[in-house]
Amino acid sequence: KTGKVGTFGGVQLPTVTIFMDGFADGVARYNKDKGANVQLIGWDKASQKGLFAETFEDKAKGTQIAEQLIQQGADVIMPVAGPVGLGAAAAAKNHAGTKIVGVDSDWYQSAPEYKDIVLTSVQKGIARAVYDTIKAGADGKFDKKPYVGTLKNGGVSLAPFHDFEGSLPAGLTGELDAIKKEIVEGKTVVTSKSAFDAKGGSGK
């Protein structure tokens, strides 16, 4: 609603910044499709510079950074910082209208104390990754290439909107499904300097 969203990381590592790159791409796609001008605070994909707590453990740091983002006008925050992200959720809960986008797992379920402010979550499909790896071994197809989770193989996904389903703009879920289809079919190519391809190389 404010026209500003925010993100921050725990430590500047590829496994963190790849989430932040994706969030930046999502904002850019929304602006393009909707003719909007939503501003992302806390991360610049082009320069790879942004906000970091420099810890994955100190929840107070998460609260501090989230407060900073909120004061700058962000009303949706995606903390990519492990337990530090829960500190951000605590800050968001104290500001009416501020929402959190969880990471790694569905925070609506894994952090139920904050479910009333969890808009959605970007999930890692750990169970699917384990299944695929074991199956590859059983089929004699296991190799040393790193497992890369994608929308196509179920290694990553967007969690349900849960309690916010009824208040979403009309047609939004259909638009998201269409974008997912574009990515899976290769019509929309998603890149990140933090990514690794299936051959073990670095991303673009």
Where are these regions (language model features)?
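A residue-level marker of the well-folded mature domains of exported/periplasmic proteins
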Residues: K1-K204
